[in-house]
């Protein structure tokens, strides 16, 4: 199974129940196709770069999951058939990229600690 992420945009004027229905439907598709659901984030309403179907704004959702190509095909088919979804895009993630993104955080923390230690040394020499 490979890791994927999908970002989809729904109409901005949907009610809470309709938005929950869409997110539940997406999670059900992943579960029915034996995928591994990781995360679903509601990024909220944002202005679109250009009007889509006469909408200037849309509510963005970020989805991360493990699955195969059949799962992607079924998920995109269901999103395409739903009139409330105005755009979607799925991307396959590489494991090396996901791990590499976590490594700079550790490096930045180590550099911050070293910087703090150097500041203490400089402060100590100034006080003497």
Curated annotation (Swiss-Prot):
Gene Ontology terms describing biological process: translation
Q: What domain of life does the UniProt record list for this protein's source?
A: Bacteria
Query: InterPro entries of this UniProt entry?
Result: Ribosomal_bS6, Ribosomal_bS6_sf, Ribosomal_S6_plastid/chlpt, Transl_elong_EF1B/ribsomal_bS6
The UniProt keyword set, sorted, is: Ribonucleoprotein, Ribosomal protein, RNA-binding, rRNA-binding
What cellular component terms from Gene Ontology apply here? Answer: cytosolic small ribosomal subunit
A GO MF label: structural constituent of ribosome
- Listed HAMAP family: Ribosomal_bS6 (MF_00360)
Concerning its family, UniProt says: Belongs to the bacterial ribosomal protein bS6 family.
Task: Briefly state the protein's biological role.
Answer: Binds together with bS18 to 16S ribosomal RNA.
PANTHER family per UniProt: MITOCHONDRIAL 28S RIBOSOMAL PROTEIN S6, SMALL RIBOSOMAL SUBUNIT PROTEIN BS6M
The name of this protein is Small ribosomal subunit protein bS6
Q: Which organism is it from?
A: Geotalea uraniireducens (strain Rf4) (Geobacter uraniireducens)
The beginning of the lineage is:
Bacteria, Pseudomonadati, Thermodesulfobacteriota, Desulfuromonadia, Geobacterales
């Amino acid at each position: 199974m490979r890791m994927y992420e999908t970002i989809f945009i729904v109409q901005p004027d949907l009610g809470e129940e309709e938005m929950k229905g869409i997110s539940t439907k997406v999670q059900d598709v992943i579960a029915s196709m034996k995928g591994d659901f990781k995360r679903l984030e509601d990024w909220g309403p944002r202005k679109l770069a250009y009007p889509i179907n006469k909408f200037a704004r849309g509510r963005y959702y970020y989805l991360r999951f493990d699955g195969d190509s059949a799962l992607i095909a079924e998920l995109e088919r269901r999103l395409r058939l739903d009139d409330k979804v105005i755009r979607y895009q799925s991307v396959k993630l590489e494991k090396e990229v996901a791990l590499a993104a976590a490594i700079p955080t550790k490096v930045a923390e180590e550099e911050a600690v070293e910087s703090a230690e150097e500041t203490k040394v400089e402060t100590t020499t100034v006080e003497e």
